[in-house]
Amino acid sequence: MNSLVATPPVPPHFYETSCRSASYSMSSTNASVNRKRKAEDDCLPSDDTRMSASPSGSPALHPRPLAPRHLKRSRPNVSGRPLSLPRLMETLDTDALRSVLRSLCDRHPEIASEVMHTAPRPSVSAALEVLNNYQSTLQSSFPLGGNPSSDYAYNRVRQHLTNLLEALNDFTPHFLPPNESQPSTSLNYLDGATDIIHRLPRWTTPQHNLEKYAAYEEMSKAWCLVIREAAKRGGGIQLQYGGWDQKLAKHNETAGGKLQDAVNELNQSLGWIGGNVGNPSYPGGSNSQGDMSIRQQLMSGTYGAGLPLKVGPW
């Protein structure tokens, strides 16, 4: 009674078609891929072609604006030319520049006058430096070995000694009154210049020492002039509190008493100020221990203490 519904069998041609269709589709797919790859390979360029061909997709480079360069145009004809005055003066040392300036002043007196009014006043240190340079040149010109005070040595250094003494005679009046109004400046110069005279050589032949003695004499006169002028300025405070009495006494001792006139002038100037009071060794000195100068009495407030005080009409 049971009835079985039988599934109709699959026709044989269906299996053949299905299997063939799967294999066919795979083979056709592989064939199309192979054909595509072959076409792409045919279209790809070779290595030589890629290296020789310029890139087509490279970005374009935009030129950047450059700053203008200011270059001197070269001269069409190169020729020699002298230096300009500023460049020429840069190559001159002190001695060469001094020589050129001296030559111009000698040929053009008006330039010499302008230089005299334009150049700054030489300081004491600058003047003493020049004199010390002459002194160094003199010392270095002595012959090696032998007697440095002999006539042979004197003849060897005579010109350098003359140059030093001439420079000393030229510089000294510049620092004396009335050309120099400051006593301190004059005294400082004389102090240094006297030291230079002390260092001058002493010769065996007495005649050769006359130049040094003459320099001491001129220096003593210069000391006297400056001391007199300093005593008039400010009551001689510069002389009293500058220690110049001791300095000048030492110079006189080193010079062998050739500055005694200057020492006497200083003692006389300090006498009315109050220096050397009670010392009978200087002219005009007082022997009274209680004698005081008018200046000291004024400064201590004792001036006129022993005088009667008058009241009322004179």
Curated annotation (Swiss-Prot):
InterPro entries attached to this UniProt entry: Cut8/Sts1_fam (IPR013868), Cut8/Sts1_sf (IPR038422)
Any Pfam family hit: Cut8
Gene3D superfamilies the record matches: Tethering factor for nuclear proteasome Cut8/Sts1
Subcellular compartments: Cytoplasm; Nucleus
Highest taxon, organism lineage: Eukaryota
Record GO biological process: nuclear protein quality control by the ubiquitin-proteasome system; proteasome localization; protein transport
Segments for region (Disordered): 25-85
GO molecular function, one term: proteasome binding
Gene Ontology, cellular component aspect: cytoplasm; nuclear membrane
Keyword Nucleus recorded: yes
Major subcellular site: cytoplasm
Keywords noted in UniProt: Cytoplasm, Nucleus, Protein transport, Transport
Assembly, per entry: Binds the proteasome.
Family listed: Belongs to the cut8/STS1 family.
Functional note: Involved in ubiquitin-mediated protein degradation. Regulatory factor in the ubiquitin/proteasome pathway that controls the turnover of proteasome substrates. Targets proteasomes to the nucleus and facilitates the degradation of nuclear proteins.
Record-linked PANTHER family: FI02826P (PTHR28032:SF1)
Protein name: Tethering factor for nuclear proteasome STS1
Native organism: Arthroderma gypseum (strain ATCC MYA-4604 / CBS 118893) (Microsporum gypseum)
Lineage: Eukaryota, Fungi, Dikarya, Ascomycota, Pezizomycotina
